[in-house]
Amino acid sequence: MKRIDELYRWLLRPPTDGPAATLLLRLMAGGVFLSEGILKFVYANQGVGRFTKLGFPWPAATATFVGGLEIAGGLLLLAGLCTRLIAVPFVIEMIVAILTTKVALYLGTSPLPLPPAPPKVGFWAVMHETRSDWAQLLTVGFLLLAGPGRWSLDARLSASAKRGR
């Protein structure tokens, strides 16, 4: 039970005294996840169509779930609320994205359209195509470890809770 309490505190009561520049990373990651989530609903080829081509089970449900997660989670990151908690599914999502799309690209077996600029397959194609995946993965990894920073709703709520004691 003690470990569960520690995990709860670590996820939902993160340190809020980190560098102010954490705000920039939160805004970048939150903005990218939010816009990518919206795109999954606006453009079928980015949502259901993409998950269908990749062979995901229940592509409509998967696209709806992932798109909804990205919209809600992106808004949470932008606000700096539950930052560590939402970073966990985002880390998992980005690892799955890299494994399901970029390994096949490397091997030249991707069901998705090839990148518009050479090279089309192999190491350098993967390096080009994974740039945003890596940026998102490393950003939410940072936020998972560092917390939301002092300019966040988590910091305001933490300060309010301390004043209320």
Show where each model-derived region lies:
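Extended, low-polarity transmembrane helix blocks
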Residues: M1-V42, A60-G68, A72-R165
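Short juxtamembrane and helix-loop transition motifs at transmembrane-helix boundaries
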Residues: N45-P57
